Amino acid sequence: MASGWANDDAVNEQINSTIEDAIARARGEIPRGESLDECEECGAPIPQARREAIPGVRLCIHCQQEKDLQKPAYTGYNRRGSKDSQLR
């Protein structure tokens, strides 16, 4: 039984929407193109095993770790489920 304005499957739709957003964000972070032999940040050689494991890699392990630490944590806020986004 639906209550208010939400349909019976609104919770599942919200969960699926959140998952789809996370997948799209993760796919957007995948490197593309040809792997570099040297790190574009520090110039250190990128090991062959890393280049084979991650096609399109552009950073050495150390620089990638530093970049990952600087990345803001994902808050989990879903704008599609926000009242404000629906009122505008």
From Swiss-Prot:
Leader sequence segment:
none
Q: Which SUPFAM superfamilies match?
A: Glucocorticoid receptor-like (DNA-binding domain) (SSF57716)
Zinc finger extent (dksA C4-type): 39-63
- Which Pfam families does this one have? zf-dskA_traR
Q: Which GO BP terms sit in this record?
A: positive regulation of secondary metabolite biosynthetic process
Q: What is a GO molecular function of this protein?
A: zinc ion binding
InterPro entries with a match to the protein in the record: Znf_C4-type_bac, Znf_DskA_TraR, Znf_DskA_TraR_CS
**Disulfide pairings:** none
Q: Which UniProt keywords apply?
A: Metal-binding, Zinc, Zinc-finger
- The protein here is known as Uncharacterized protein YbiI
